[in-house]
Design a protein with these regions (language model features):
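Conserved catalytic or metal-liganding residues and their short signature motifs at active sites
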Residues: 1-146
Length: 146
């Protein structure tokens, strides 16, 4: 048996439960919107998976990782795009970070980077601006004006 998330129903037999524990580790949907800090993001994610907020903060602020990906501790929050992600409950903090980084890299296509550059912005600045706009108005129709 491995650590994880499992579903056990009332009508399951002992054999069904054992088979479930052996082979049916369920994915957890981890969702977050704009967070105001890496600490709040780590706390939000740690409430939904086994990894604790300290281990998440450790990998989120790892200076080697940040420098290899052209981020600083101040801009690192922009790498973690608000969305829903699926993880197994016992996914390590490093694997969580890797999946979130991969989503960031997939999102920022060369076309999107060119559009940002045409507006005189970097991808990090676009993320910051988007977070401000979303925070200032929860009314979707008002957001383009802001």
């Amino acid at each position: 048996m491995k650590a994880g998330r499992y579903r056990i129903a009332r009508d399951m037999t002992n054999n069904d439960i054992i088979n479930s524990l052996r082979s049916q580790n369920l994915a957890v949907t981890v969702a977050f919107n704009n967070q105001h800090s890496l600490g709040l993001l780590a706390q939000r994610i740690s409430n939904q998976v086994e990894a604790d907020s300290l281990s998440l903060m450790g990998v989120f602020t790892d200076s080697l990782f940040l420098s290899l990906n052209s981020f600083s501790k101040e801009s690192a929050l922009a790498m973690y795009l608000p969305n829903s992600y699926e993880f197994f409950w016992n996914t390590s903090a490093k694997k969580i970070r890797s999946k979130l980084q991969k989503a960031y890299n997939i999102f920022w296509t060369s076309n999107r980077k060119q559009k940002a550059k045409a507006m005189g912005l970097t991808p990090v600045e676009v993320s910051i601006l988007a977070a401000i706009v979303q925070e200032e108005s929860k009314e979707f129709t008002e957001q383009p004006r802001i």
